[in-house]
Design a protein with these regions (language model features):
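N-terminal accessory targeting/assembly segments
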Residues: 1-114
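Switch I (effector-binding) loop of TRAFAC-class P-loop GTPase G-domains
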Residues: 2-4, 196, 202-209, 227-259, ...
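Conserved catalytic network of the ASCE P-loop NTPase/AAA+ motor domain
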Residues: 10-11, 75-77, 242, 250-254, ...
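Conserved Switch II/interswitch segment of TRAFAC-class P-loop GTPases
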Residues: 22-26, 54, 58-61, 88-91, ...
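Short, acidic/turn-prone active-site loops that include or flank metal/cofactor-
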Residues: 110-114, 239-240, 347-349
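Short alpha-helix plus adjacent loop in nuclease-associated cores
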Residues: 111-130
Length: 421
């Protein structure tokens, strides 16, 4: 098994060439840099890029024929096996561009991200969400593959009309199959969401405040969680290392226990199908008491990344939830000084973690109270809220009862009425 693992690890990445149409709608260079990082996350190496500035796409092939000839030549010279387009393509555009590139495989940005999600999903829900997104992506593109379906589905006798009819029948069968699978997946995910809602209610009963780490993918959210709570969450210096939400208990300096949630990372122009498919996962942030927006201190695109994060959060009705901004990875050489309202942290060195914990305590201060109580020995069960949802700082067994000093949540204060000292 280890030998097979070593072989798989040493497999060289697939060489790809990047294609882009620059219509002036966004920073094309930055977008291509992000696309190259996405390729790396999918075990691909971008060896060249071809960009064309034009306001309107070329009919059928998006880029001009001259640019595609340039791309084909570069791919042949550099050994690229696949072309990745920085945008979304229709089925017919994929086929036409592939033909212009001599039959080379062509995928678009959305398909690349979907493939990354497919390979990274761990839980059953994550896998189902990814499959649903893939099917919704492929459904409108089945028509674009009509000609190849016709060639594959045509019979031996008869003319072209018979072959086209067979192809159309296969296309309709494909559509029905995809629609049926989409409906089945949606039903399963709805059941899972109902169970997730029940879990949230159970979690709410514990009274433990929820703090969600949100932000662009690969900014170190999982590393930050591990630095705060101790190693447990998988870390990787790559895009979309975390797809399924992970929850850990964290005790703040005040003694208050909170639930820290690591969420799926965002990316600019995240495909709509993915936003919809992973909405239940992203909605973990909407149930938070505090949202920690995490960015990479050394990334000059951090402000744009936070804007993407806020855009997604605003769509999840998180506007009224307090937000805290953290620039992680401040140990990197190109990290700079920032606004004093922004916390600088390094999950690697531990810098700034104490300040982050203190700030969380401040934001959640109205949720807890420090109290002293004396519980009769026949009422020791009343100590449970302090033990389970707060913290016990002093515990003494006295002649007349159990003396406790500690922190309790505001909603648990009524449990100790009549026993405060």
């Amino acid at each position: 098994m280890s030998e097979l693992y070593d072989i798989l690890v040493e497999t060289p990445p697939t060489k790809v060439i990047l294609l882009a149409l620059d219509q002036g709608l966004w920073d094309c260079e930055r977008s291509l840099n992000e696309l190259a990082a996405l390729c790396e996350a999918n075990h691909m190496e971008a060896v060249a890029s071809v960009t064309q500035k034009r306001q309107t796409p070329e009919t059928g092939i998006v880029l001009g024929s001259g640019k595609l000839e340039e791309a084909a030549a570069a791919a042949g010279e550099l050994g690229a096996e696949c072309a990745v387009f920085d945008g979304e393509l229709t089925g017919s555009q994929i086929r036409n561009i592939s033909t212009a590139l001599g039959g080379m495989e062509v995928i678009d940005r959305t398909m690349l991200i979907l493939e990354i999600f497919r390979s990274r999903a761990v839980t059953n829900e994550g896998k189902l969400q990814t499959e649903l997104a893939l099917l919704r992506y492929r459904l409108p593109r089945l028509q674009g593959m009509g000609e190849s379906l016709s060639r594959q589905g045509g019979g031996g006798g008869g003319g072209g009309g018979a072959r086209r009819g067979a192809g159309e029948t296969k296309l309709e069968l494909d559509r029905r199959h995809v629609h049926a699978r989409i409906d089945a997946l949606a039903e399963k995910l709805a059941e899972m969401e109902q169970r997730r809602g029940e879990s949230r209610k159970a979690r709410a009963k514990t009274g433990m405040p929820v703090v969600s780490l949100v932000g662009y993918t690969n900014v170190g959210k999982s590393s930050l969680m591990n630095a705060l709570c101790g190693p447990s969450v998988a870390e990787a210096d790559m895009l979309f290392a975390t797809l399924d939400p992970t929850s850990r208990k964290l005790v703040l300096p005040s003694g208050m226990a909170v639930l820290l949630v690591d969420t799926v990372g965002f990316v600019s122009r995240l495909p709509h199908n993915l936003v919809e498919a992973f909405k239940s996962t992203l909605e973990e942030a909407a149930w938070s008491d505090v949202i920690v927006r995490v960015a990479d201190a050394g990334d000059d695109q951090r402000e744009e990344q936070l804007a993407v994060t806020d855009e997604v959060l605003d769509g999840l009705d998180c506007a009224d939830i307090p937000r805290l901004t953290v620039y992680n990875k401040c140990d990197k050489p190109n990290a700079l000084n920032f606004d004093p309202d922004i916390l600088l942290t390094s999950a690697k060195t531990g810098y700034g973690l104490d300040a982050l914990l203190k700030k969380l305590d401040e934001l959640l201060s109205d949720r807890v109270h420090t109290i002293r109580v004396l519980l009769p020995y026949d009422k020791l069960g009343l100590a449970a809220p302090m033990r389970e949802r707060g913290s016990v700082q002093v515990e003494e067994y006295r002649e007349d009862g159990l003396y406790l000093e500690g922190i309790v949540k505001t909603e648990d204060l009524h449990c100790f009425e009549g026993y405060l000292v």
